[in-house]
């Protein structure tokens, strides 16, 4: 991005794939960076028991452990995000670039082989250095009471009291579970065999 509107250094854009996320910026255009930069929170796993002390039957976050601003009652197993500005509160000021939509490099190559009347033609194609926002994981590795959806098999490994080291959030409908974060950003690089032709 070389230039935006006058006195503008960045532009936020939402991805309109679901009403839960319509109001959240998912992409950012920023001067000096490539287009298609993904925007959200840096995921740090789930809150573990050691992040809390117990007061009776209640889990209370230890001093210095940041909490999500719109959560009234942070509990073990809930999503944990990086407090980028260090104020102890996870809020919109802690969102940042979390993925790169455009590849650093793309290409392909083809080659032909002949042997005793046989001929073989191959074409490989690649993309390197780009990320993918896997929005499916926002819905199929995530409990949201407004939907009745089957979940991915990986969701069986979510945080539970019997599985307290998991970094897949607990089955709980919470505001911290409804944000775009680096948890769903995946490496989009690939090398694929696009065509293969064998003749005689």
Predicted regions and their residues:
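Conserved small-residue
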Residues: 1-99
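Extracytoplasmic gating/loop element in the C-terminal half of outer-membrane beta-barrel translocons
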Residues: 76, 127-200
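Transmembrane beta-barrel strand/turn architecture of Gram-negative outer membrane proteins
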Residues: 1-43, 105-142, 196, 200
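Secondary-structure capping and boundary motifs in well-ordered enzyme cores
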Residues: 89, 103, 189-190
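Low-complexity, intrinsically disordered short peptide segments enriched in small/polar/basic residues
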Residues: 25, 57, 111, 165-167
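Flexible glycine/proline-enriched surface loops and loop-helix/loop-strand junctions
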Residues: 103-104, 181
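Outer-membrane beta-barrel domain signature
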Residues: 96-100, 184-187
């Amino acid at each position: 991005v070389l230039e935006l509107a006058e006195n503008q250094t960045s532009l936020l854009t939402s991805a309109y794939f679901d009403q839960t996320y319509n109001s959240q910026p998912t992409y950012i255009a920023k001067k000096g960076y490539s287009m298609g930069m993904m925007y959200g929170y840096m995921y740090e796993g789930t809150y573990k028991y050691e992040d809390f002390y117990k007061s009776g039957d209640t889990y209370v976050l230890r001093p210095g452990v940041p909490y999500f601003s719109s959560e009234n009652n942070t509990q073990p197993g809930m999503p944990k995000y990086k407090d980028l500005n260090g104020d102890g509160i996870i809020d919109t000021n802690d969102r940042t670039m979390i993925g790169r939509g455009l590849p650093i490099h793309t290409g392909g190559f083809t080659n032909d082989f002949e042997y005793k009347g046989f001929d073989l033609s191959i074409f490989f194609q690649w993309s390197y250095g780009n990320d993918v926002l896997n929005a499916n994981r926002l819905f199929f590795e995530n409990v949201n009471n407004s939907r009745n959806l089957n979940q991915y098999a990986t969701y069986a490994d979510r945080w539970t009291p019997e599985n307290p080291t998991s970094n897949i959030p607990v089955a709980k409908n919470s505001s911290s579970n409804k944000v775009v974060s680096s948890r769903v950003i995946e490496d989009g690089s690939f090398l694929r065999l696009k065509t293969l032709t064998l003749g005689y």
